[in-house]
Amino acid sequence: QNYKGNLEFIIIDDNSKDGTKKIIYNFRNEDSRFKYLSTTNLSSNLKHKKKALDLGIDKAQYEWLLFTDVDCRVKDNWVNEMSKHYKYSDYVIGLSRVEENKSFVSKFQSIDFSMLMISASSSVSMNNPLACSGQNQSYKKSIFEKVNGFNEISDLLQGDDSIFLQLCQKIKNI
């Protein structure tokens, strides 16, 4: 990333078996901004992704949090582009797309996800965001703390993105 401000990369390993720890430690040898955290042996009422996100947010040293997923590719200017919107809102929703291949399922997934992103974009333009994707969103740590994190939605398997966005809207016009 070519962002010039304070930045850290927190990688949370949610019990993967793919050598994530070794990969991140190799990155850390070249760039001290990389941090490795693991949910192994972590006691929490949260499950899966929300448990991992909660750990990373707790350990984050900066106010603004920016999220993507391990299977996503971001451009070199991703942090710069998202941070341009920080002066306008405490919660920034980025658009994403699914990389498609020639299979029918892939094409269908791409269309389905594109429709979600179009709906999300439209609702944002009407100052009433309804949905977002956890693979491209950013919000302030203080907002997360103000809504008591994911605790209200801890029983849901998902919800770290759109449902969490709706929780945040209850306390602040985003």
Regions found by a protein language model. Name each.
Residues T39, T68-V70:
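Catalytic metal- and UDP-sugar-binding loop of GT-A-like glycosyltransferases, i.e.
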Residues E145, G149-I163:
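Donor nucleotide-sugar recognition loop
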Residues G19, V70-H85:
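Acidic donor-binding/catalytic loop of UDP-sugar-dependent glycosyltransferases
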Residues L65:
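Short aromatic/hydrophobic "clamp" motif used to bind/position activated sugar donors
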Residues D14-K17, C72-V74, V98, Q137:
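Acidic metal-phosphate-binding loop of nucleotide-sugar-dependent transferases
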Residues Q1-L42:
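Acidic donor-binding segment of Leloir-type glycosyltransferases
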